[in-house]
UniProtKB/Swiss-Prot annotation:
Job description of the protein: Microtubule inner protein (MIP) part of the dynein-decorated doublet microtubules (DMTs) in cilia axoneme, which is required for motile cilia beating.
Entry superkingdom: Eukaryota
Keyword Metal-binding: no
Keywords, alphabetical: Cell projection, Cilium, Cytoplasm, Cytoskeleton, Flagellum, Nucleus
Quaternary structure (record): Microtubule inner protein component of sperm flagellar doublet microtubules.
Subcellular location: Cytoplasm, Cytoskeleton, Cilium axoneme; Cytoplasm, Cytoskeleton, Flagellum axoneme; Nucleus; Cell projection, Cilium
Taxonomic source organism: Bos taurus
Region (Mn 2): 139-149
Region of interest called Mn 1, as start-end residue ranges on this chain: 98-109
Protein's recorded name: Cilia- and flagella-associated protein 68
KW Nucleus (keyword) present: yes
Leader sequence residues: none
Disulfide bridge partners, by residue number: none
């Protein structure tokens, strides 16, 4: 096959693809969104609005932890999973116990009453999992706007020169 024959063949192939695209409304491409096996079909301008994730008028996964793909960390440390009690030890469990487990994994089970639901700012917010030194749940903008102004209150989280621990030279 010569170069001119190959050029004619490629033009013919391109015309066939274009003709197939113009005559078949379902001809399009499958776009892989990322490595989590999501497939977006891009057949025409309106097809994307019928796919999962594009519909905005339904209540699909309203702010659940499965909205983000591959969000295993948030699923693992969700309050629903933490509050569930651990299974009771088996009578044969000592056969499978390793020296590492006996040395390092001897923590007592945590009580579930400490995970009492606290006020949260948005549906996925879990302020009860934040350690106390970092917990700074102040008033929201809505609460600040519609409450009596407090001039003597200073937040610990906002830098205040009177609370500064560094001495000037």
């Amino acid at each position: 096959m010569t170069a001119t024959d190959y050029h004619c063949y490629s033009e013919f192939f391109q015309r066939q693809v274009l003709a197939c695209f113009l005559t078949n409304p379902h001809y399009g491409s499958l776009i892989n969104a990322d490595g989590h096996a999501e497939v977006w079909t891009d057949w025409n301008d309106m097809s994307k609005f019928f796919q999962y994730g594009w519909r905005c008028n339904t209540n699909e996964d309203a702010y659940s932890n499965r909205t983000l793909m591959g969000n295993w960390n948030q699923e693992r440390y969700d309050l629903k999973n933490i509050v569930q009690p651990k299974p009771l030890p088996s009578q044969f469990g000592h056969y499978f116990e390793t020296t590492y487990d006996t040395s390092y994994n001897n923590r007592r089970p945590l009580s579930t009453h400490r995970f009492k639901r606290e006020p949260h700012w948005f549906p996925g917010h879990q302020p009860e999992l934040v350690p106390p030194p970092y917990k700074c749940t102040e008033k929201s903008t809505y609460m600040t706007s519609y409450s009596k102004p407090q001039t003597d209150h200073h937040s610990v989280c906002v830098w205040n020169p009177s609370n500064c621990q560094f001495q000037s030279p």
